Design a protein with these regions (language model features):
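A short alpha->loop->secondary-structure connector
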Residues: 55-69
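"Short basic amphipathic alpha-helical interaction patches in structured regions
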Residues: 52-59, 128-130
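Active-site environment of non-heme Fe oxygenases that use a 2-His-1-carboxylate facial triad
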Residues: 1-21, 26-27, 34, 39, ...
Length: 167
């Protein structure tokens, strides 16, 4: 990884080859898409890289897992989950920018990635559930509930609308 090689917005799958990691990343992708839906990866040497190099590696690997996209209307490519001391009771504050415990929720993506740079002194645990695995378990136990999953749901974008999106 070289911080002066590419800007994040210039990175593509082709411009960020993974000659030694490629097969492993493809196996992760298969696990995510057709297996358990969850893949824990450990051992990226983030302590040896600058923040720019970490971002480049994360974004580049992401291109091998899917198609990364902007995180918000400001077109930020990477969102940082940390406490910015924002008011938790403000309905427009994103909870990932506070020290609040975040309940299970759905992110608007097929694949979500998290990379820990600095473990929290307290808390900071992530819980994940594969929607595919959850669907299959629910289908086995309560198939009569499945039609409800295909009904429209309310979506709270916390005031972060990208032009052309419905609220």
């Amino acid at each position: 990884v070289s911080q002066d090689s590419l800007a994040l917005e210039e990175v593509t799958r082709d411009s960020f080859p993974l000659p030694t990691l490629g097969k492993k990343v493809e196996a992760w992708r298969q696990t995510i898409m057709t297996g358990t839906g969850v893949q824990v990866v450990k051992g990226l040497p983030v302590g040896q890289w600058s923040e720019a190099e970490i971002a480049l590696a994360y974004w580049g690997i992401g291109h091998h897992l899917g198609t990364p996209g902007a995180q918000n209307p400001d077109n930020e490519l990477l969102g940082h989950v940390k406490d910015y001391d924002e008011a938790r009771d403000d309905p427009f504050v994103r909870l990932y920018r506070t020290n609040s415990n975040i309940r299970y929720h759905c992110d608007a993506a097929d694949i979500v990635g998290l990379l820990c740079l600095k473990p929290a002194k307290t808390g900071g645990k992530s819980r994940v559930v594969s929607t595919g695995s959850l669907f299959n378990a629910l289908y086995q136990r309560h198939p009569e509930w499945i039609p409800r999953l295909f009904e429209p749901i309310k979506l709270d974008r916390r005031g972060e609308l990208i032009e052309g999106q419905k609220p």
